[in-house]
Structure formats: structure tokens, C-alpha cells
């Protein structure tokens, strides 16, 4: 099994975006089980001081031993099928943990970006981090359905 964690800066509480992200993470866990993908978890962290450097300090302990994908506006934008294939390759290459990072309002600290194995973007636009986590969870769910042959994804 390849555990997938969406690691985010900031807590959404009961916001509708948080519920949407949790719903898609749950669906991804259920759909990915037979594919050795998951569980898919969302972990929220908060820094005690403001700023990207302080956020980096609370993110860093969660990265050890993981394949790290930083969500950043300058990262690679994946088409859904290619993203599904990429997740399958990460699993097949023996990665036991993949951590997707979503920074706070100012993005991720350069030291975290440098430590990441890769960066990915949700297109050329900038998205609020609350929406980004829901979009990422949905894409992980979509990837699991693509890999399982489910009709959820349509080209």
C-alpha cells in the first residue's frame, strides 16, 4: 500500500471546502484500496508564528521517508490520466508514502520547495488553499477511478 497524505498549512474547521476535501479523500481511500493506493489522509498543521519559515518548521517533520510533491503555481500541471499513471508509477517504484504539500496564503518556503521531489500546479491560475485541497483530493480520487476502469472520468 502507498499511503497518501495531503499535508496543509492552516485549519479549515467546518468550512464547506474542508468537508468536500474529506469526502473525496474518503472516496479515494475506498476506490484505491484494491489498487494499493491509500489510505488518503488530510493532515492540517499550524505554525505558532507567522511566515513561511515558521510554516516550514511544522511541515518538515512530516516529510521524512516520504516522496514529497509540493503544490506550487510554478509546478507541473498534470492532465488527469497522466496524473493517474504517475501515481501508479510512484506506487510501482516502491514508494510507501507520498505527501502532497499545500502551503498557507503565501505559499511554501523555498527550503520546503527545494526538499520536495517534485512540484505540481493546478494550472496557471492561483487557487485559495481551501479549494486546492478539495481539488487535489478529487484528482487523487479521479486517479483511482481511472486506474480501476471506473466510468467516473470521461475524456
From Swiss-Prot:
Entry superkingdom: Bacteria
Entry GO terms, CC: cytoplasm
Enzymatic class: transferase
Pfam families tied to this protein: SPOUT_MTase
Assigned EC number: 2.1.1.177
Gene3D superfamilies: 3.40.1280.10
Disulfide bonds: none
Predominant cellular place of this UniProt entry's protein: cytoplasm
GO MF assignments: rRNA (pseudouridine-N3-)-methyltransferase activity
SUPFAM superfamilies linked: alpha/beta knot
Localization annotation: Cytoplasm
Reaction(s) catalysed by this chain's protein: pseudouridine(1915) in 23S rRNA + S-adenosyl-L-methionine = N(3)-methylpseudouridine(1915) in 23S rRNA + S-adenosyl-L-homocysteine + H(+)
Entry keyword set: Cytoplasm, Methyltransferase, rRNA processing, S-adenosyl-L-methionine, Transferase
Residues involved in S-adenosyl-L-methionine binding: 103
Presence of the UniProt keyword Cytoplasm in the record: yes
Family assignment from sequence similarity: Belongs to the RNA methyltransferase RlmH family.
Subunit structure: Homodimer.
Function: Specifically methylates the pseudouridine at position 1915 (m3Psi1915) in 23S rRNA.
Protein name (database record): Ribosomal RNA large subunit methyltransferase H
Species in which this protein is naturally found: Caulobacter vibrioides (strain ATCC 19089 / CIP 103742 / CB 15) (Caulobacter crescentus)
Amino acid at each position: 500500500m502507498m499511503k497518501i497524505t495531503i499535508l496543509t498549512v492552516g485549519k479549515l474547521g467546518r468550512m464547506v471546502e474542508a468537508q468536500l476535501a474529506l469526502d473525496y479523500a474518503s472516496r479515494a481511500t475506498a476506490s484505491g484500496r484494491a489498487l494499493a493506493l491509500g489510505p488518503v489522509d488530510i493532515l492540517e498543521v499550524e505554525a505558532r508564528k507567522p511566515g513561511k519559515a515558521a510554516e516550514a518548521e511544522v511541515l518538515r517533520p512530516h516529510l521524512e521517508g516520504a516522496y514529497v510533491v509540493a503544490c506550487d503555481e510554478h509546478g507541473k500541471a498534470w492532465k488527469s490520466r497522466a496524473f493517474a499513471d504517475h501515481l501508479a508509477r510512484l506506487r510501482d517504484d516502491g514508494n510507501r508514502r507520498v505527501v502532497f504539500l499545500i502551503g498557507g496564503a503565501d505559499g511554501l518556503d523555498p527550503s520546503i520547495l527545494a526538499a520536495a521531489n517534485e512540484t505540481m500546479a493546478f494550472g496557471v491560475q492561483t487557487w485559495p488553499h481551501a479549494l486546492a485541497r478539495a481539488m487535489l483530493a478529487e484528482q487523487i480520487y479521479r486517479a483511482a477511478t481511472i486506474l480501476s476502469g471506473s466510468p467516473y472520468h470521461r475524456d
